[in-house]
UniProtKB/Swiss-Prot annotation:
This protein's name: Small ribosomal subunit protein uS4
Top-level lineage group: Bacteria
Encoding gene, per UniProt annotation: rpsD
Annotated S4 RNA-binding domain residues: 91-151
Family indicated by similarity: Belongs to the universal ribosomal protein uS4 family.
């Protein structure tokens, strides 16, 4: 599947948000790249909406065409379109693996899923965009559990803080999805209403 593979720090600086998680280079220079990076530029309404859409795309590692499909589905669902969109993105398998503490970044989680290291409800899933459901059980494949990465992750999971809608069992590297997240439980710096306004034009 196509995905953005360019310099993450530069993209973070342009959108003024840490897209990676723990990006020290961004923390040192949290302003857009280039000579005019520190300058305060008057931003149009359209630019703000576009930036928010791009921010969501790059946080979750979603290409434009797929993101548009997410929005269309979110718009068809009952409730607030923006909140529906964020919940759908947060429910991606790669994001759940990241939130559970089995990967340092969403990009790494996407790679781990793509390489076939996880099973959902007993069935192998290697699609990062696979959306989990309430009561799903996610396990690391038995062969994969012997990898150095998962052995190290297992030690770190004991003290890991995970979202309330998930539960992690460190001894078995199991993730339990107690419920789908509510918007208030999703701690990303995103103004999803601006995305709704962008697509409503």
């Amino acid at each position: 599947m196509a995905r953005y593979t360019g310099p993450a720090t530069r993209k973070s600086r342009r959108l003024r948000v840490d897209l990676v998680g723990g990006d020290m280079a961004f923390e040192r220079r949290p302003y857009p790249p280039g000579q005019a990076g520190r300058a305060r530029i008057k931003e149009s309404e359209y630019l703000l909406q576009l930036q928010e859409k791009q921010k969501a795309r790059f946080i979750y590692g979603v290409m434009e065409k797929q993101f548009r499909r997410y929005y269309a589905e979110a718009n068809r669902r009952p409730g607030k379109t923006g909140e529906n969109l964020v919940v759908m993105l947060e429910s991606r398998l790669d994001n759940v693996v990241y939130r559970a503490g089995l990967a340092r970044t969403r990009r790494q989680a996407r790679q781990l899923v793509s390489h076939g290291h996880f099973v959902v409800n007993g069935k192998a899933v290697d699609v990062p965009s696979f959306r989990v459901s309430q009561y799903d059980i996610i396990d690391v494949r038995e062969k994969s559990q012997k990898m150095n990465w998962f052995e190290e992750a297992q030690d770190n999971l004991v003290d890991a803080i995970v979202p309330a809608w998930l539960q992690v069992v460190p001894s078995t590297l199991r993730i339990l999805v107690h419920q789908l997240p509510e918007r208030a439980q999703i701690d990303i710096p995103l103004q999803e209403q601006l995305i709704v306004e962008f697509y409503s034009k």
